[in-house]
């Protein structure tokens, strides 16, 4: 919103429309207009006026939120001499509006906290606030709100205050932490039975624990700690207060992760939590699930904090295994949501024990894990009145999947075979109800793959028992038994006499709608593992494939069946493969031809993606072993299918989703036959370029990268592939030149640089000598700022591989030429690239991208270290040394230290470490 400042009346109208306009488009227009206002420089003055006038809750909330947003994102717009008056104004507003609405108070508290963090001239802000407001009981709620959000905002991603300022703030808050604790004690004394005040106290205390600035020795003997456990032990504590106290204890436990340096507080928390067992049982008796969940969170956090002690000194001191008993008590609760809270701890315990690899230690924990697994098997039981198959996508279905993953990770402590046999014996010896049987089969399916299938009579017995289950058992039992059979495909492979009965059993399932998808998945597993044995059943698989749509399968299950069929097909004699592949593809090709011939009409789907996906999976997994000189058996089939794929692509050229599936299908066809697809190269490239000039589907760039990968080393294909690249670059560059082109088209960026990287890998000299290399590199430099994981990774990989070409494979005859060409490129754009990479790391990209950037810098350094040293020095000179408010972002020493660390690095990871530390100064 440039130009004149809007009137307050106009702003009020927009706010009213945002909240009260019955027309959604009116709300949308108001939202857009107010968003533009918030981004403008007028927002400061307007929000201040709205807060002064206090016309209604909505306008005050908008103004408070705007203030917070402006301070977070546009603080540089204000002159330094206005900061003090802004602070005073905000403090006046929060005092005047303290009774209007809690959400407004929170927004203003955040604004004040963010201001304090960015205003170095406001020294000792905690002391100032406490002195100003602590004696007025009516001001305590908003004072506590400010003191709660202040530590939370220190590490906020919205504020780029830099590591130097952050360190200064944390030291300042640590210095005044005792003042805050004293204030909280005073608030407790004044609160009496005021529950809201106690909740604010606990929230504030938790926030200071989370920042890690409270003195643990001081806190160990503090009355606030005793009060927390008192509140948690009392049966009459309300749910809200209980949750606030629980959160605070969890924060305290998290804060003492380094137990040795916080021993007195660790001991107090340890003893305090152990006293809560009785209160937990009381909450269970009262069926108060909220409190039960809170206790379980506390018990889990206790175990997480003392994990090292539990593993290293089990049963001694802080390694006391009563901690695990508490979690197992929670695992016994009938609601599965309770035990689920502790899953992360059990994962971590398993990980630690796996690394220690100590049989004696493992034996101590075995009984605990066995008890946990029994509890989990119980939790996995469906309701006795459940009808049909188990749901996999609802909350309970997802819980069962997490149980399955956890069991797989912990089974080594019990022993897969021992556990499998125990579970089976419960089915064999008793006559449990169906829901118990189903849950046991579910756990058995989770561990079946980790049981050694070699000469294992129990596994054989289980397999035999399952395939002879009567059809009268509950559908859910049949469903899970089918899943178990699929997981036991290794056993079938070792005992091929079972193949026929297993396939017979699975075919019955395939013919029943509720079981069809599970049966298809199991057949897919059997095909994957028993490829050689399944070759004799190929005709049966072909029959299934021909009548695929007569089974009630999910699209994924149908594709899985075809994948299994293709894997078996690849094991047939070469002379049979061509004919069988043609048979396998014929149904899908006929369907595509039918869609091409029919006129578009209402009610009839003309979507070819189902058939394209099926062809893609067939090509992807038909990978026979072909000797050099032999014609690929799939070549003829793919050449026959090409006209149908080409026509489908042409018909749906404007539809990105369908074109993407066409390209995917062609990609796997090309990969399937490799250089055997040479006859398709010319017509395919011509069609790609023609369609791409009209419709910029990025999947064409990806398909281009596949063609370069397959043919880039063929002398006769290089010029044609370069022509393709140059033709594709023209519309690509035009697309990216549009406003916000990079941000709006990350897939195009990703696929463009995949294509360019393939060229560098397969035919570097062809690209380096071309006209297009400099524009591509310029776009790569521009794209380094793009905060998109895949796109950025592709850009960095291109830059790394491009520069590496100048030093790689120095024994090859084209080395000197490559070295010279890279030298020319770098002399033209090297300084710009280094400056951009440094700027990008400091101001644009998240930390996870730094290893990729470090690799690019490392490669530049390998080409010419002295020149790189100069480029880096120039780049560092261009960085801002102070914030707009005068806080030091980076000192001269920090700049010279970073330069030295990078330029003297002997390994790439040293560059990465230096970058990590340096970029924190700007975050």
From Swiss-Prot:
The modification Phosphothreonine is found at residue 896. The keyword Transmembrane does not apply. The keyword Lyase does not apply. Keywords: Acetylation, Cytoplasm, Nucleus, Phosphoprotein, Protein transport, Transport. Gene3D superfamilies: Leucine-rich Repeat Variant. It is found in: Nucleus envelope; Cytoplasm. The modification N-acetylmethionine is found at residue 1. InterPro entries: ARM-like (IPR011989), ARM-type_fold (IPR016024), Exportin-1/Importin-b-like (IPR013598), Importin_beta-like_NTR (IPR051345). One of its GO terms (molecular function) is small GTPase binding. Pfam families: TPR_TNPO3_IPO13_2nd, TPR_TNPO3_IPO13_3rd, TPR_TNPO3_IPO13_4th, Xpo1. Its main location: nucleus. Interacts with (GTP-bound) Ran. Interacts with (phosphorylated) SFRS1 and SFRS2; leading to their nuclear import. Interacts with NUP62. Interacts with RBM4. Interacts with CPSF6, promoting its nuclear import. Importin, which transports target proteins into the nucleus. Specifically mediates the nuclear import of splicing factor serine/arginine (SR) proteins, such as RBM4, SFRS1 and SFRS2, by recognizing phosphorylated SR domains. Also mediates the nuclear import of serine/arginine (SR) protein CPSF6, independently of CPSF6 phosphorylation. The nuclear import process is regulated by the small GTPase Ran that partitions between cytoplasm and nucleus in the predominantly GDP- and GTP-bound form, respectively. PANTHER family: TRANSPORTIN 3 AND IMPORTIN 13 (PTHR12363), TRANSPORTIN-3 (PTHR12363:SF42). This is Transportin-3. It comes from Mus musculus.
């Amino acid at each position: 919103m440039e130009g004149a400042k809007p009137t307050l009346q106009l702003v009020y109208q927009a706010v009213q429309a945002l909240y009260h306009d019955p027309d959604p488009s009116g709300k949308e227009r108001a939202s857009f207009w107010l968003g533009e206002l918030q981004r403008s420089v007028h927002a400061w003055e307007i929000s201040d006026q709205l807060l002064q006038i206090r016309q209604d809750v909505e306008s005050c909330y908008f103004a408070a939120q705007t203030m917070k947003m402006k301070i977070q994102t546009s603080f540089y717009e204000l002159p330094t001499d206005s900061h003090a008056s802004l602070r005073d104004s905000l403090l006046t507003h929060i005092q005047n509006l303290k009774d209007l609405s809690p959400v407004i108070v929170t927004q203003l508290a955040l604004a004040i906290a963010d201001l304090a963090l960015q205003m170095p001239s406001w020294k000792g802000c905690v002391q100032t606030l406490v002195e100003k407001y602590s004696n007025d009981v009516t001001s305590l709620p908003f004072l506590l709100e400010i003191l709660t959000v202040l530590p939370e905002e220190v590490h906020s991603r919205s504020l780029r205050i830099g590591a130097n300022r952050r360190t200064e703030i944390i030291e300042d808050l640590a210095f005044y932490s005792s003042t805050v604790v004293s204030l909280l004690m005073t608030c407790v004394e004044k609160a009496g039975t005021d529950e809201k005040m106690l909740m604010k106290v606990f929230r504030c205390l938790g926030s200071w624990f989370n920042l890690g600035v409270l003195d643990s020795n001081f806190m160990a003997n503090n009355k606030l700690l005793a009060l927390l456990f008192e509140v948690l032990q009392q049966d009459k504590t309300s749910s809200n207060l209980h949750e606030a106290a629980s959160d605070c204890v969890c924060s305290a436990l998290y804060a003492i992760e380094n137990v040795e340096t916080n021993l007195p507080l660790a001991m107090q928390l340890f003893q305090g939590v152990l006293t809560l067992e009785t209160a937990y049982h009381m909450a269970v008796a009262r069926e108060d699930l909220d409190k039960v969940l809170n206790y379980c969170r506390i018990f889990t956090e206790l175990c997480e904090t003392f994990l090292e002690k539990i593993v290293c000194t089990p049963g001694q001191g802080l390694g006391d295994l009563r901690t695990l008993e508490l979690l197992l008590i929670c695992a016994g609760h009938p609601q599965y949501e309770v035990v689920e809270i502790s899953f992360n701890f059990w994962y971590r315990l398993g990980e630690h024990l796996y690394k220690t690899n100590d049989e004696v230690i493992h034996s101590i924990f075995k009984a605990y894990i066995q008890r946990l697994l029994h509890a989990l098997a119980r939790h996995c039981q469906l309701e006795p009145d459940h009808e049909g198959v188990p749901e996999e996508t609802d909350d309970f279905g997802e819980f069962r999947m997490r149980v399955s993953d956890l069991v797989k990770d912990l089974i080594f402590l019990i022993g897969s075979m021992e556990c499998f046999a125990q579970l089976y014996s419960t089915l064999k010896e008793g006559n449990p109800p169906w829901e118990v049987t189903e849950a046991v089969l579910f756990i058995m399916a989770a561990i079946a793959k980790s049981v050694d299938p070699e000469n294992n009579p129990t596994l054989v017995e289980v397999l035999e028992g399952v395939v002879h289950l009567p059809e009268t058992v509950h559908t859910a039992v049949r469903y899970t038994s089918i899943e178990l059979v699929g997981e036991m495909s290794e056993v079938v492979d070792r005992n091929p006499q079972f193949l026929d009965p297993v396939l017979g059993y699975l075919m019955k399932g395939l013919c029943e709608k509720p079981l069809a998808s599970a049966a298809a998945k199991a057949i897919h597993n059997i095909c994957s593992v028993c490829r050689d044995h399944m070759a004799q059943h190929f005709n049966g698989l072909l029959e299934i494939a021909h009548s695929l749509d007569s089974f009630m399968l999910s699209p994924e299950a149908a594709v899985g069946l075809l994948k299994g069929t293709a894997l078996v097909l690849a094991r047939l004699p070469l002379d049979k493969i061509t004919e069988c592949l043609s048979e396998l593809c014929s149904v899908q090709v006929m369907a595509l031809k039918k869609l091409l011939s029919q006129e578009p009409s209402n009610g009839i789907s003309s979507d070819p993606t189902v058939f394209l996906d099926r062809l893609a999976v067939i090509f992807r997994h038909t990978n026979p072993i072909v000797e050099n000189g032999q014609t690929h058996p799939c070549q003829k089939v793919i050449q026959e299918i090409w006209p149908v794929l080409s026509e489908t692509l042409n018909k749906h050229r404007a539809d990105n989703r369908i074109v993407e599936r066409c390209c995917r299908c062609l990609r796997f066809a090309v990969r399937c036959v490799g250089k055997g697809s040479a006859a398709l190269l010319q017509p395919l490239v011509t069609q790609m370029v023609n369609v791409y000039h009209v419709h910029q589907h990025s999947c064409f760039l990806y398909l281009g990268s596949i063609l370069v990968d397959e043919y880039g080393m063929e002398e006769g294909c290089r010029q044609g592939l370069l022509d393709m690249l140059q033709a594709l670059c023209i519309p690509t560059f035009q697309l990216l030149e549009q406003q916000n082109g990079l941000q709006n088209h990350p897939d195009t960026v990703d696929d463009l640089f995949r294509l360019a990287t393939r060229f560098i890998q397969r035919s570097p000299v062809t690209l380096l000598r071309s006209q297009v290399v400099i524009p591509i590199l310029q776009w790569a430099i521009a794209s380094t700022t793009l905060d998109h994981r895949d796109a950025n990774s592709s850009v960095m990989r291109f830059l790394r591989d491009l520069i590496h070409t100048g030093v790689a494979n120095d024994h090859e005859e084209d080395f000197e030429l490559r070295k010279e060409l890279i030298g020319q490129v770098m002399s033209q754009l090297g300084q710009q690239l280094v400056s951009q990479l440094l700027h990008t790391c400091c101001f644009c990209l998240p930390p996870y991208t730094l290893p990729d950037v470090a690799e690019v810098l490392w490669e530049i350094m390998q080409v010419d270290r002295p020149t790189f040293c100069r480029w880096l020095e120039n780049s560092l000179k261009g960085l801002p040394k102070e914030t707009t408010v005068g806080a030091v972002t980076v000192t001269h020493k920090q700049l010279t230290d970073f330069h030295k660390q990078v330029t003297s690095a002997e390994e790439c990871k040293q560059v990465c470490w230096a970058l990590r530390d340096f970029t924190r100064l700007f975050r």
